[in-house]
């Protein structure tokens, strides 16, 4: 799927998305964070800002969370840009979604190595689940219709019991609720933000204890990368979809694309 090198190549920002744009009175005034800048294909910047994760709560508006792709492409060309090649745009949309998933994993690796032991790094590392779901939404069309329509397996039942002594998940939930009721209201500035990050981390941990999920499968990953197994294999897409839904429901249950995927795939929670 790799397209030919861009000819001519142009300056690519590398992190061109709404979070790095300054706008005043309806006009773009600055673009921030140029540390990923390089020469390459202009489609890369256009696709990156259209990733679901950067639409900030508006997954229904595929162009930066602001509008339709058709209007975006037309405005880009009218402003002096080139015509958009849909195949190149799609390649970069898939590629940069995978790239960001690897970036999230890299943050977890940085935390483990001691290079950056900040709480934010280890929590952002769990956002890999968002990109796993987005990739399945992007790539599902490559599967045969019968596989796209195949019902999903049932979700894994919770392991939590409401009898006996409090479970580990309930202990974690109790700490999270204490932070919310006793600590967060009095926190100021960055401390208030970090309390929210800590609560998010505890929520992830509690849900993981309630529904233990370990879908790491290196043999399957290697087989998919080599092409030995594909989405045409009966039941594989349904299995991957269920795994992605369950993982994301535990890690980032408020991610907007989760509800979209459940609806499109006919999945129960």
Give residue spans per PLM region:
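Activation of the activation-loop gatekeeper triad in protein kinase-fold domains
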Residues: 32-37
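All-alpha amphipathic helical-bundle segments outside canonical DNA-binding/catalytic cores
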Residues: 83-95
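An alpha-helical support segment within catalytic cores of ATP-dependent transferases
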Residues: 1-14, 25, 78-81
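Generic structural concept
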Residues: 95-98, 102, 176, 199-202, ...
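Long, amphipathic alpha-helical stalk/connector segments used for oligomerization, subunit docking
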Residues: 136-162, 171-180
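Active-site activation/catalytic loop segments of kinase-like enzymes and analogous catalytic loops
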Residues: 44-81, 95-115, 130-138
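C-terminal amphipathic alpha-helical interaction region
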Residues: 162-178, 182-196, 207-269
């Amino acid at each position: 799927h790799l397209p030919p090198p861009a000819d001519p190549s142009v300056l690519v920002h590398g992190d061109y998305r709404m979070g790095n744009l300054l706008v005043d009175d309806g006009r773009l005034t600055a673009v921030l964070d140029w540390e990923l800048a390089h020469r390459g294909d202009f489609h890369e910047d256009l696709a990156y800002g259209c990733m679901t994760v950067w639409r900030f709560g508006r997954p229904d508006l595929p162009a930066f969370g602001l509008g339709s792709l058709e209007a975006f492409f037309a405005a880009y060309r009218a402003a002096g840009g080139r015509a958009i090649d849909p195949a190149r745009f799609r390649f970069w949309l898939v590629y940069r979604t995978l790239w960001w998933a690897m970036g999230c994993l890299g943050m977890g690796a940085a935390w483990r190595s001691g290079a950056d032991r900040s709480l934010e790094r280890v929590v952002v590392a769990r956002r890999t689940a968002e990109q796993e779901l987005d990739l399945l939404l992007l790539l599902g069309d490559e599967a045969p219709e019968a596989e796209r329509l195949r019902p999903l397996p049932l979700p894994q039942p919770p392991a939590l019991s409401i009898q006996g002594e409090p479970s580990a998940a309930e202990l974690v939930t109790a700490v999270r609720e204490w932070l919310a009721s006793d600590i967060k209201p009095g926190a100021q500035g960055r401390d208030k933000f970090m309390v929210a990050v800590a609560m998010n981390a505890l929520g992830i941990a509690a849900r993981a204890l309630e529904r233990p999920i370990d879908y790491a499968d290196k043999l399957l990953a290697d087989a998919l990368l080599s092409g030995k197994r594909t989405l045409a294999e009966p039941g594989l897409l349904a299995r991957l979809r269920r795994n992605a839904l369950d993982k994301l429901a535990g890690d980032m249950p408020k991610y907007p694309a989760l509800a979209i995927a459940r609806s499109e795939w006919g999945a129960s929670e």
